[in-house]
Each structure stands twice: as C-alpha cells, then as structure tokens.
Amino acid sequence: MAPVPELTSEMMAYYSDENDLFFEADGPEKMKGSLQNLSHSFLGDEGIQLQISHQPDNKSLRHAVSVIVAMEKLKKISFACSQPLQDEDLKSLFCCIFEEEPIICDTWDDGFVCDAAIQSQDYTFRDISQKSLVLSGSYELRALHLNGQNMNQQVVFRMSFVHGEENSKKIPVVLCIKKNNLYLSCVMKDGKPTLQLEMLDPKVYPKKKMEKRFVFNKTEIKGNVEFESSQFPNWYISTSQAEEMPVFLGNTKGGQDITDFIMESAS
C-alpha cells in the first residue's frame, strides 16, 4: 500500500480534528454528537433503519459528508409508517433531502440545443381568398387559384417548431418547402424587408435554434393563421388581391394585402 502523504500547509487550512473520526485504519469506530452509536439504529420509533458497514472502502470525504447530511435531514422528518417502506415511499423523501434550484441560461449553445428533438408537421396554405401557394421558377412563391386538375401544384410546407420569443399567442416556427428543402427567410434588400427562399443543408437544418431571419411568429386568429417575421416585427407573409402575384413580406393588415391563411394538414 502506498504511504499516505503528509498534509501540506495549504491542505491543513481545510483540516478539522473531527475528520479523524471518519477515517481510521479499520473503519469508523466512533462519531461525535448526534452520529454516536449509529452502527445499527433507527430514525425515530418507526422509521428508516440505518446500518453502517465497517468494511473499509475508497469512498471520499465528500461521499461521507453527503450521506451524513442526508441522514441528518431524514432524522428531522416525521411521517407515518404503518408498513415496510417501498420504493415509491422513498422517492417522496427526495424533495425533503434535496433542494430544487432553477437553471438559468442566458445564451444557447447550438451544440447542446441541436440534440433536442425537432417537432415538425406538413401543411398546405391558402389565403382567405382561396388562392394556393405554388413554386414559380426555382426561388419564387406565387398565389393563384387552383382547381381539381392542378391542385397538385400547390407546395407542401414542413413547419418546424423552434426556439424564439414564445408567448401565449405567438408560436415561433420555420417554414420549409418540403420537396426542395427551400426555407422562407426575411432579409433587408434596397432598404426594405423582403421575403425570399433559401436552400439549406438537410443534414444541419432544421435545428432547434434557427437564425432569426428564418423564424416566423405564428398566430391563430378566428381559425386562420398569420406569420409575422421575427427579424422584422409587424411585417407579415402576405399575398396580393390580384391573381398569380408573388408572395411577399408586407406591413399592412386589414387592407388590400392578405395576411390571413387557411392551414390544412398534409401529413
């Protein structure tokens, strides 16, 4: 067995004579105060039986103190015990031993956030004038009326729920054209917020914390939905009253521009 090193002056600053009672050659033989004669005892008249093994082990002082603190707290708890304790009974004691503390995180680490499962659903959208959204060319959405013969032209969006400024009315989401993996995003062009489509790597996206330009705050209004840009508040995904016009980002509600959409499941 390797010799025990001498205590340095720095280590002595954390040394207490009481530590000698915990670590002896053949295990603890005596303890001061309320821990005396606990080799075989009960916590109260009817409680948890405590047995201390005198077999030497390699548990650290931290382990010993953790056990002692827990036992001291349990000794102060009074509860009825008309039958032997079961696992469920012991679980209820954890809240008496441990104190729950909130974890405050001011910033997100994408390395951890991306491990969380992304909830996604497939939908089609029509504006309240019954115009469907179709892909025109490679990177442009247009709104037009479709009939039974060409209904298959409407795009299917995968809507994913992500982190954002969520409240009781607004839900942060991203919208991706499922077939082409094109994401709706909001950028500033020529001094004006603009809606565009961006192709992203499906191995990376969607992720729980998306770049803000991709995030829309979804709000339900009388059975319909609207999508407000997170990057540009008070700017919404909009369509024109005219036929086959591009879908755009607008800041007018209740006027000529249409911001309310009918959402139908495509899953």
UniProtKB/Swiss-Prot annotation:
Site-annotated residues for Important for interaction with integrin: 170, 178, 189, 203
Main location: cytoplasm
Propeptide, residue positions: 1-115
Cellular compartments per GO CC: cytosol; extracellular space; lysosome
Complex and partners: Monomer. In its precursor form, weakly interacts with full-length MEFV; the mature cytokine does not interact at all. Interacts with integrins ITGAV:ITGBV and ITGA5:ITGB1; integrin-binding is required for IL1B signaling. Interacts with cargo receptor TMED10; the interaction is direct and is required for the secretion of IL1B mature form. Interacts with HSP90AB1; the interaction facilitates cargo translocation into the ERGIC. Interacts with HSP90B1; the interaction facilitates cargo translocation into the ERGIC.
GO terms for biological process, alphabetical: cellular response to lipopolysaccharide; cytokine-mediated signaling pathway; fever generation; immune response; inflammatory response; positive regulation of canonical NF-kappaB signal transduction; positive regulation of cell division; positive regulation of immature T cell proliferation in thymus
Protein name stated in the entry: Interleukin-1 beta
Compartmental location: Cytoplasm, Cytosol; Secreted; Lysosome; Secreted, Extracellular exosome
Gene transcribed to yield this protein: IL1B
